[in-house]
Structure formats: C-alpha cells, structure tokens
Amino acid sequence: MASLIYRQLLTNSYSVDLHDEIEQIGSEKTQNVTVNPGPFAQTRYAPVNWGHGEINDSTTVELILDGPYQPTTFTPPTDYWILINSNTNGVVYESTNNSDFWTAVVAVEPHVNPVDRQYLIFGENKQFNVSNDSDKWKFLEMFRSSSQNEFYNRRTLTSDTRLVGILKYGGRVWTFHGETPRATTDSSNTANLNNISITIHSEFYIIPRSQESKCNEYINNGLPPIQNTRNVVPLSLSSRSIQYKRAQVNEDITISKTSLWKEMQYNGDIIIRFKFGNSIIKPGGLGYKWSEISFKAANYQYNYLRDGEQVTAHTTCSVNGINNFSYNGGYLPTDFSVLRYEVIKENSYVYVDYWDDSKAFRNMVYVRSLAANLNSVKCTGGSYDFSIPVGAWPVMNGGAVSLHFAGVTLSTQFTDFVSLNSLRFRFSLTVDEPSFSILRTRTVNLYGLPAANPNNGNEYYEISGRFSLISLVPTNDDYQTPIMNSVTVRQDLERQLTDLREEFNSLSQEIAMSQLIDLALLPLDMFSMFSGIKSTIHLTKSMATSVMKKFRKSKLATSVSEMTNSLSDAASSASRSVSVRSNISAISNWTNVSDDVSNVTDSVNDVSTQTSTISKKLRLKEMITQTEGMSFDDISAAVLKTKIDKSTQIRKNTLPDIVEEASEKFIPKRSYRILKDDEVMEINTEGKFFAYKIDTLNEVPFDVNKFTELVTNTPVISAIIDFKTLKNLNDNYGITRTEAFNLIKSNPNVLRNFINQNHPIIRNRIEQLILQCRL
C-alpha cells in the first residue's frame, strides 16, 4: 500500500551529508548580534543609537497677550481684541470702513473743566467740547454713520488703567464703556465689517476673543506688571506676520547631518495602482461542482510621472480577514454547488505593498516619521459564469466595497527575482452598492466583494495621495545602505513554498481517479516516491535524506513515538482482568477516554467529544496495524506522489516541508470504523458517530461501552466510503450485502470497479477526498 512511505519515514534512517547540515543551520538557526561601533566609527552599519536630529516644531502656541506693537494703520482680524494703551491726551485711535462706520476715541485727562478742543480726525479738524471732573481718565467714543454727518459722543469709558479695546465680531464692532473696575462691552452695527481698518496712535496688544475674560480683566485692573517695565520694547506689527514658504509638492530635505550619516525627509506624490488576484478551482467529475473561489496576492508594475520625472512602481495587493461563503444546490452529482467562495466585507482589510525606483526607496532601512494621506476608491465586482454542462448557467454578479486609507508601515515585497523594502498601505473596507447575487439560485442581495471577478475587467484600480518619511542614509549619496537581514534564506524559502503550495492545490482537478486507486495499492518507497523528479540518483538520495530529517520532527512522527511509548508502558503493567473497567483502562492509551463510563454516556455531547478525540488517534493504530483494505493514508500518499510528478516547482529545499505538511494536512475530515459480526461502529473527526447493520444499513444505538471493548483488539478500518455515502448509494441505486461489506472494508478492487463504471456517487466521494488533499 502507498502509505508504506509514511511508515518508512517513521522507521528508517539515512546518512546525512555535511553539506545538508550546514545548509540547514544557515536556513533555520537565528542568532542575536549586538553591534556597538559608536556614532562615528568606520562601519557599514548605521549607528546603533541614532537620534532624530533637529526637529522643526510646527506647533503654534497662541499668546494670551501678544505685544506691545508700535502705532500703525492696519485692518484688524475678526475675533481678536485690539487692546490700546493710551499714554497721552488726544486721539487714541480712528476706525472706519468708508461706508457706514466712522469712529474715533479721544482721551481726556482728569480734572478738566468744560473746554473746546481741536482734534485731527480722518484728516479733518474737528472741535469737541470735553470735560472730566473725575480722578480717572475719560475716553470719549465719537461716532458718525455717514461722511456727511457730524460726530457725536456715543459712549464713554472712565478708566484709571488708561486701556481701551475694540473687537470685530459677529457683524458688529464691540468696545468697552462704563467705569472701571466695572466696565462692560457694548456694540455698534455695520453692514461692512470686514473692511473696517484702524489707525492706532499708541502702543497696543492683540488678544484672541477666546480670552475675552482676560481682556476684561486688563481693561478693569490693568496690565500684568511685566508689561510695565522699561525692558519691554514695542515691535512693528510686521514682526507678527509669518513669512509663508510653501513646501514643494515633491521635495527632499536634509534634516540633520553627522559625519557618515544624514537624515533625509522625502515628501512626494504617489499614485498606487493595484489589482486583485483570484484562484478558481473546479474539481473533476460531471462538471457541476466548484471547490474554491479565493483571493490571492497579485503583482502589478507600471510607470507614472512625478514632478516631471518618470517613476517605475511595483505593487503587490493582498487581502486579510476574508469571509467564507458556500452554496449547495443539493447532494446529487448533477446539483450545482460551490464548496467555498471568499468575500471581503467590513471586517476585512486590503494591503497594498508599494515600491518605486526613486531615491526615497533606495535606502529604506532606517525610517521614522512615516506618514501618508490617500484618497478612497470603490471596487466593483463583475460577472462570472458557472459553465455547467446542461441547463442555464448560474452567474455570480455584482458586489462592491470602498477602500479607505487606514495606515502605513514598512514591509518587504517579494517579486519573482528580488525582494524590495516597501511601504505597506493598509485599507479598511465599507460595503457599497450594488449587492451581489448568484443568478438562478437562492443566493441574492448579499453585500461585499466576492473573489469570482473582483477587477470587473479593469486592468487596475488607482489611488492617489501623498507620503512622507524620514530616512537615515549615508552622507555620501554614492554609498548604498546595507540591507541587513531584509532578505534571508528562510524568507526566500517561504516564497518558494507558497508558490509550490498554490501549484499543488491547483493540481487536484488533474488527478485521474482510476490511476489514483492503482497508485494507492503500490508499495511506494523512498525512491519510487521521488522517481518522477528529474534528477540524478544521487540527488534523489539526497532528497530522501532531507525528507527523512524533516519528517522526524513532524506531528505525525511525534504522535506515533508518544503512542508507542504509552502502549509499551501500559503493556508492562496491564491487568489480565476482562472487566469493562480494565478494557477502558487499556483503550485510554489510544483514546484518553475517561475511566468513568457513566460520565461518558451521560449525554450525546460527551459521546461526541470523546469520539472526536478517539478518531484522531485511530489513524495511528491503523498505520501501525495495517489491514488489507485501502486507507486514507494510501490515498494521501498516492495524491502526493501524483502531484510531485506533475509539479514544475519541486526543489530539494522545498520537498521536505511539502511532505511533512501533506502527512499532517491531507484529508483532515476522516472516518474510521470497527466491524463486529454484522454490526459496524463508525466515528469521524468531527465528533459524529454511527452504528448500523451491514445487511440493511439501518442505524442502531451506538454503545460506547461496546466500542471501547472492541477498539483495543479489533482492526481499525478507514471509512473511505463513509456511512452517509453508503446510505445514499443504497437508497438511490441499491447494493448487495457483498458489495456493502466490501465497501465497508474499503476493498480496493471493489472501489476500482465502481470508479471504472463511472458511478457518480462513488466518484463524487473520492473527488471530495482528493480535494481535501490541500496544503
């Protein structure tokens, strides 16, 4: 039987070349190395402790009291109080919009009897009668609404702090009036607030309206003491103006430089083009079944102009957080079904790894302050026809998601020939219209983007935006930063393994079942297993050696070793009693079944849990005590042999991993049975259990006590044709007792006869087993 290859891998040993040991150490061993050469040492490594260099702080802190500023004429901003510190009598300020607002404030010193005084206001000599009988200064707000009218005293502020204020806000001009320390604000209407300018004849300050309480405090109580010293020199208002220097759209800026290294900030536009990859697998058979429709990573290379310079870019698009859907139109071989198709929705993410040939990516090893800003894009699915042999074709159509930028990190992007240090842009998803459906089925009005046709005929999807990063690079631009450990032997091996896994999985539909049964009956050994590989005898031996070494560490080998030791210990101390309890104690070495049978039989859930545990270990017993019937491992080894022969990507360094994975992952859903007289007891890895009669295939109660007695001393048989398939076969076609008995025993000759007769139910069952041979 083909499963002999697994037993050989478990028991045989091969000589090991020194070259194999060295190669294994180089690919698997890791070591932490600390390099501490100092910041200026002559080394090809970057300084171990490198700082951020000079940082341009762009944080703006708005002062509460900004000033003092020298007398000037300007248009004050809205939402800011102008606080004027008057130091003499006469005109304090003039303000107008030349349409409906003219105002001037004149200061009158204390103890002034009524008197006519001349004032120069807006270029005109005006005479006002003023007086002040208090100990405080008076500030008279003179107002007119037209250039033809005369000024009149609209409001007065009596103050001992000699401060007045004016504010443009909410379509009105606000000033203070009353007497300090209880002065309050009042306002005047105007239809043209924005054009009001002011000529100030004294020093002044600027206070944001958000700090109006402080302005009120200053008006009523005076300025802080620090503002009243001779060391405070008023500045020109122009010093408050910021000289804006707009950064170039695409610009490289040197931030800091120390000897061998410098920090460069790269700011640039970016155009990201990407496409989704997908894989559609249709198994053999009558042509009504699809086993998988899935997303896979897709590369895309393109050119575009950035600031007049042509850039060559490379992207890799992948998805994470996929949702698995399925459609089952029935259990007959001619019923349309899709075992699994993938859909991305709100809980999914799309990753786009981006690299281009610009300077920013040349030395992308030591990077900080990585940021990006990208727009969103909508991805709409197209149509995919399920071309069934007879009848109207079902069609998967529609579906849409919108991608929204959610972050950026560094990544390593693998191409066919080289690994590139890249930027990984992460996008969150929201579902969008239209919904998707499978026409002529019950699947309608579902939301998300299915993997059947995610690009909808588009060559690519495009996202534009900007990115910025600071990179530590050599001061001499001719030097290349060493890319330490960005590409290792193991990473390259993982890429090869990924490609090989995809190829192996896609080969499932190319396996002819009649040839598979014949191959499963052959006693495959090391050299016949690998004979299909184009190589010399020496290389085949070397491959067998590598596979043997890898297989020794597999879960299967470890489980068999532990089971053998456990049985050996149990045999040396086992009681000769034939009671139920002693039988359960013996079976516990196989199954870990509880000693307390009553606890096991309390509920169906307990039985399900125990039978699931038992079934996973029955494989080991079947492997050690081979029966005449065909086993799941025979099919697994035959499929592995067939795929190795058909593969174009098998390498010496990838074969051991593939064989190990195949032994553990091929056919995860297995059923095993035990025969006693005319009764069959069957359990599977999903925890389901059946007991039935051979003659009628009618179910009978499943007796756990009886099962635990039988499993120790009775051969275990792989249920190649499981109970569900047997019932379907008998109900639709009818089978004799002899045929049923041979199918229950997994007789390979009977299986071959059914397959040669192209029996749809048996073929469908074997197809499902082949489809489970996936990595």
Swiss-Prot record:
Gene3D superfamilies: 1.20.5.170, 2.60.120.200. A motif (YGL motif) lies at residues 447-449. It comes from the Viruses. Residues 65-223 are annotated as: Spike head. The keyword Ligase does not apply. Disulfide bonds join 317-379. Residues 483-510 form a coiled coil. The record marks 230-231, 240-241, 246-247 as: Cleavage. InterPro entries: ConA-like_dom_sf (IPR013320), Rota_A_VP4 (IPR042546), Rota_VP4_MID (IPR035330), Rota_VP4_MID_sf (IPR038017), VP4_concanavalin-like (IPR000416), VP4_helical (IPR035329). Residues 388-408 are annotated as: Hydrophobic. One of its GO terms (biological process) is permeabilization of host organelle membrane involved in viral entry into host cell. Keywords: Capsid protein, Coiled coil, Disulfide bond, Hemagglutinin, Host cell membrane, Host cytoplasm, Host cytoskeleton, Host endoplasmic reticulum, Host membrane, Host-virus interaction, Membrane, Outer capsid protein, Viral attachment to host cell, Viral penetration into host cytoplasm, Viral penetration via permeabilization of host membrane, Virion, Virus entry into host cell. A motif (DGE motif) lies at residues 307-309. GO terms for cellular component: host cell endoplasmic reticulum-Golgi intermediate compartment; host cell plasma membrane; host cell rough endoplasmic reticulum; host cytoskeleton; membrane; viral outer capsid. Residues 247-478 are annotated as: Spike body and stalk (antigen domain). The keyword Disulfide bond applies. A motif (KID motif) lies at residues 643-645. In group A rotaviruses, VP4 defines the P serotype. Belongs to the rotavirus VP4 family. This is Outer capsid protein VP4. It comes from Rotavirus A (strain RVA/Human/United States/P/1974/G3P1A[8]).
